[in-house]
């Protein structure tokens, strides 16, 4: 076959967007949770211990004890449509598809762990004949545990392909002006609905301190996100704080811890708090069960009177707008025309090699 023939080249002109998040069990049962945790906790990006040390602990202790407890937690937040994380993620993909209608972009969802998998999502894009791939991890703050692990999974799948697409993958958007604006909007709406609280807590998923000491920028990016949002709202330093949740194991993690912060505030006389979790692109076990149920109960039991959880951005119009902007920016040069009007401010931005221009634009917006 002539390699210049259309049959050999394939389509190769359309853009495929892979939306990806952490993942979820298929059911709130010990068996399903065990299967999910086995895949999740076997990732060397997640637990950076020597395999000969960690795997016996994982299979001999963790997978024997934790699934039953975790399944009960999942059952508390499981919806009629299934896992909240999967439901919100599917809605995000559907809304983004609608937002990009007519631009020759195919959006698929693939979870890092569980189903639908990154592999199945990439195979769907290959079957559709896309020649350009934009991987969009829904982790605003970069960490090797999350974003880099997505890169690993994509690379493993593509490693078995003979014909590779062009690939781009942003490494986060923790200080993206649109993201900061959307988080700020969500907080303002909560303040209008429930009143201005005594304290606002920015709660991010925790990370072992050892990972930060090895160079992971996650902690600094969490602080930067919270500071940008607080500054945009004009909050005084004594009215807000950053804390880290979901700590497990005996190791030191990024501090202060969310639960300890909330209970200490209540005991010190803080009566009302609102908690926002900007690192979670969709509500999930860590926000709905850990924060909105268990941490709420702990705060009230310690003497607090009013606790409000501010939902994740989920598939809100503001969030879909962020995702659209990210696709337009990182797909620059791939699309015949970026979504929206050609001269629309903020649509054209970061393509490969345009990081400096983006940073200058961001400084100007500040």
Where are these regions (language model features)?
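Active-site-proximal alpha-helix that buttresses catalytic centers in soluble enzyme cores
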Residues: 1-366
């Amino acid at each position: 076959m002539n390699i210049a023939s259309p049959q050999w080249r394939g389509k190769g002109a359309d853009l495929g967007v892979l939306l990806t998040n952490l993942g979820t069990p298929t059911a709130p049962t010990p068996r399903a949770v065990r299967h999910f945790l086995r895949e999740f906790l076997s990732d060397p990006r997640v637990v950076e211990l020597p395999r000969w040390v960690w795997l016996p602990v994982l299979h001999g202790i963790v997978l024997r004890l934790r699934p039953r407890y975790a399944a009960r937690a999942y059952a508390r937040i499981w919806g009629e449509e299934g896992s909240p994380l999967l439901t919100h993620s599917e809605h995000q993909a559907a809304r983004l598809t609608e937002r990009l209608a007519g631009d020759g972009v195919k959006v698929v969802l693939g979870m890092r762990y569980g189903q639908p998998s990154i592999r199945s999502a990439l195979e769907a894009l290959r079957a559709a004949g896309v020649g350009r791939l934009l991987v969009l991890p829904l982790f605003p703050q970069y960490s090797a545990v999350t974003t880099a692990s997505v890169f690993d999974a994509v690379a493993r799948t593509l490693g078995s392909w003979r014909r590779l697409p062009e690939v781009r993958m942003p490494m986060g958007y923790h200080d993206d002006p649109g993201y900061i604006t959307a988080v700020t909007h969500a907080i303002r709406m909560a303040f209008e609905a429930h009143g201005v609280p005594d304290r606002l807590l920015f709660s991010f998923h925790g990370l072992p301190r050892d990972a930060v000491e090895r160079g992971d920028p996650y902690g600094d990016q969490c602080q930067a996100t919270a500071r940008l949002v607080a500054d945009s709202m004009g909050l005084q330093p004594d009215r807000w704080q950053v804390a880290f949740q979901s700590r497990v194991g005996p190791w030191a993690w990024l501090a202060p811890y969310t639960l300890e912060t909330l209970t200490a505030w209540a005991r010190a006389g803080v009566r009302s708090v609102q908690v926002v979790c900007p690192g979670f692109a969709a509500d999930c076990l860590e926000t709905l069960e850990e924060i909105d149920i268990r941490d709420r109960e702990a705060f009230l039991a310690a003497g607090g009177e009013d606790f409000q959880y501010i939902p994740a951005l989920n598939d809100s119009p503001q969030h879909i707008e962020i995702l659209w902007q990210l696709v337009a920016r990182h797909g620059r040069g791939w699309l015949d025309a970026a979504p929206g009007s050609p001269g629309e401010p903020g649509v054209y931005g970061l393509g490969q090699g345009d990081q400096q221009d983006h940073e200058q634009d961001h400084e100007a917006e500040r």
